[in-house]
Amino acid sequence: MQLYTYLYLLVPLVTFHLILSTGTLAHGGTLTERRSTDTTALKPEPVLLQKSDARSTDDNDKDRLTQMKRILKKRGNKARGEEEHSKYQECLREIRVNKVQQEC
């Protein structure tokens, strides 16, 4: 009976000691920093793009950044041009009128 009591207490201690000393679990997964060094070794190095490759172009092979700068300069650095802004305001008015008519 005493032998079973000692084994009952000894087996968990031995397995816990083995897990901590080897740093591995039953399936071979690591508990220590080995896993983190492996993942950093697998990370790809960043690709350095040239300035021309980094910029996107549209269907006509024109630089989108340059086109956007021209558009903003033409609009006076506003988010929308005057025409787009007036169309947006008209749509808002129509929506408000429709809501008022639906409530009545």
From Swiss-Prot:
The modification 4-carboxyglutamate is found at residues 83-84, 90, 94, 103. GO terms for molecular function: ion channel regulator activity; metal ion binding; toxin activity. Residues 27-80 form a propeptide. Keywords: Calcium, Disulfide bond, Gamma-carboxyglutamic acid, Ion channel impairing toxin, Ionotropic glutamate receptor inhibitor, Magnesium, Metal-binding, Neurotoxin, Postsynaptic neurotoxin, Secreted, Signal, Toxin. Disulfide bonds join 91-104. Its main location: secreted. Residues 1-26 form the signal peptide. Residues 29-87 are annotated as: Disordered. Adopts an alpha-helical conformation in presence and in absence of divalent cations. Calcium facilitates disulfide bond formation of the synthetic peptide. Conantokins inhibit N-methyl-D-aspartate (NMDA) receptors. This toxin has the highest potency for the NR2B/GRIN2B subunit, followed by NR2A/GRIN2A, NR2C/GRIN2C, and NR2D/GRIN2D subunits. The cysteine framework is C-C. Belongs to the conotoxin B superfamily. This is Conantokin-P. It comes from Conus purpurascens.
